From Swiss-Prot:
It is an enzyme of class 3 (hydrolase). Its EC number is 3.2.1.51. Coiled coil: none annotated. The modification Phosphothreonine is found at residue 173. It comes from Bos taurus (Bovine). This is Tissue alpha-L-fucosidase. InterPro entries: FUC_metazoa-typ (IPR016286), Fucosidase_C (IPR031919), Glyco_hydro_29 (IPR000933), Glyco_hydro_29_CS (IPR018526), Glyco_hydro_b (IPR013780), Glycoside_hydrolase_SF (IPR017853). The gene is FUCA1. Belongs to the glycosyl hydrolase 29 family. One of its GO terms (cellular component) is lysosome. The record marks 299 as: May be important for catalysis.
Length: 468
């Protein structure tokens, strides 16, 4: 009798388990009460609630690479095709008449994009030496040519035309061998794609281009290369509803192979920039004046007049080393990341002047990286735009962009205590300091050394511990 009762109870318990297993509970949307990861819905309130993966804020410095068929004419800028045949600017029409046959089309540049000297390991070594923690490569710019064998970019991709190589895949392999995060730039629009022009003519009430080209390529890039970052662009003519951006991002955050680590920017529709996305670019070369309340990135180019390589650049167009370091310092102090662009040649070479600038950043970071990587904004960001602060743990870093008169640095913001200690990164000895006669902050007596003996040529970092 007892065994029959026990058996009956076990049977009832099994039935209960089966019933409960068949019940589909609604997804948890409040991370505070979830045991499983939340499911994001395809709308901005939900997508914007996703926490930014920590690696991006810790990285601080990345390298941007603009490379494509525009690297063949290498004149004016990477917008060459649009300036020539979209806007029909006279200087571009004259350039073509003077240098190419009358019937030469933009597609004829494709076979000349050879990447003959492209060595992904050499590029990756350079980016590593530059101190970059992530690299973003153009997979497709507004011209529509793809740097990978896109199945929906027939005869206008790097496998079919030009290099006959998977440039995105090769660089990704080399980058990741060096523990650098890999990001992919992708333009939503294509200037002259017939389906895009058809949708444009229809007032973007149809989505022939999005369904046949944009979305298939984005899903392919994610599944094929598993990027750490997607740098979207080319959004400005249409709302995010045309691009189906929220549907893609919901899949990316919920079900993609990179759902836990991937980071995205804010260019997903004409209504999104500086409002929606993982982090904000807002606009090219964006520099806020005060500390934003959202993670952001400043993207800028060593060549101030172009993102792609151009043969007509002059020395005056090249950003100097001290300006690059100053922008990096100010960006990080204000809570941002700094993404510095280079444009390789059609052959796949990064010209010496670009290499020199990148290596200068790497040299500076080898001494001062402690104040940059994984740092946080301090309670005060700057003093008189000549001293910029960062913090990490109990340490505060004051980065001075100009050497003060008589070698005495006045800092108003830090409050000294009985345990205050002051050093300069790159110099072993403690620095002497005293309370500021003004009653606020302290005076730091900088090392009396010839310029060649200082840790760096510009932007010196004072490390403060035991201050409030």
């Amino acid at each position: 009798m007892r065994s029959w009762v026990v058996g009956a109870r076990l049977l009832l318990l099994l039935q209960l388990v089966l019933v409960l297993g068949a019940v589909r509970l609604p997804p948890c949307t409040d991370p505070r009460h979830c045991t499983d990861p939340p499911r994001y819905t395809p709308d901005w309130p939900s997508l914007d609630s996703r926490p930014l993966p920590a690696w991006f804020d810790e990285a601080k410095f990345g390298v941007f690479v603009h490379w494509g068929v525009f690297s063949v004419p290498a004149w004016g800028s990477e917008w060459f095709w649009w300036h020539w045949q979209g806007e029909k600017l006279p200087q571009y029409e004259s350039f073509m008449k003077e240098n190419y046959p009358p019937d030469f089309s933009y597609a004829d540049f494709g076979p000349r994009f050879t990447a003959r000297f492209f060595n992904p390991d050499s590029w990756a070594d350079l980016f590593k030496a530059a101190g970059a923690k992530y690299v973003v490569l153009t997979t497709k710019h507004h011209e529509g040519y793809t740097n990978w064998p896109s199945p929906v970019s027939w005869n206008w991709n790097s496998k079919d035309v030009g290099p006959h190589r998977d440039l995105v895949g090769e660089l990704g392999t080399a980058i990741r061998k060096r523990n650098i995060r890999y990001g992919l730039y992708h333009s939503l629009l294509e200037w002259f794609h017939p389906l895009y022009l058809r949708d444009k003519k229809n007032g973007f009430k149809t989505q022939y281009f999005v369904n046949a080209k944009t979305m298939p390529e984005l899903y392919d890039l994610v599944n094929r290369y598993k990027p750490d970052l997607i740098w979207s662009d080319g959004e400005w003519e249409c709302p995010d509803t045309y691009w189906n951006s929220t549907d893609f991002l919901a899949w990316l955050y919920n079900d993609s192979p990179v759902k836990d680590e991937v980071v995205v920017n804010d260019r997903w529709g004409q209504n999104c920039s500086c409002h929606h996305g993982g982090y904000y670019n807002c606009k090219d070369k964006f520099q806020p004046e005060t500390l934003p309340d959202h993670k952001w990135e400043m993207c800028t180019s060593i060549d101030q007049r172009s993102w792609g390589y151009r043969r007509d650049m002059e020395m005056a167009d090249i950003t100097n080393e001290s300006t690059i370091i100053s922008e990096l310092v100010q960006t990080v102090s204000l809570g941002g990341n700094y993404l510095l662009n280079v444009g390789p040649t059609k052959d796949g070479l990064i010209v010496p002047i670009f290499q020199e600038r990148l290596l200068a950043v790497g040299k500076w970071l080898s001494i001062n990286g402690e104040a940059i990587y994984a740092s946080k904004p301090w309670r005060v960001q700057s003093e008189k735009n000549s001293v910029w602060y960062t913090s990490k743990g109990l340490a505060v870093y004051a980065i001075l962009l100009h050497w003060p008169e008589y070698g005495i640095l006045s800092l108003i913001s830090p409050i000294a205590t009985s345990t205050t200690k002051v050093t300069m990164l790159g110099i072993q000895k403690d620095l002497k300091w005293s309370l500021n006669p003004s009653g606020k902050g302290l005076l730091v007596f900088l090392p009396q050394l010839p310029p060649a003996a200082l840790p760096t040529e510009f932007a010196w970092t004072i490390k403060l511990t035991g201050v409030k």
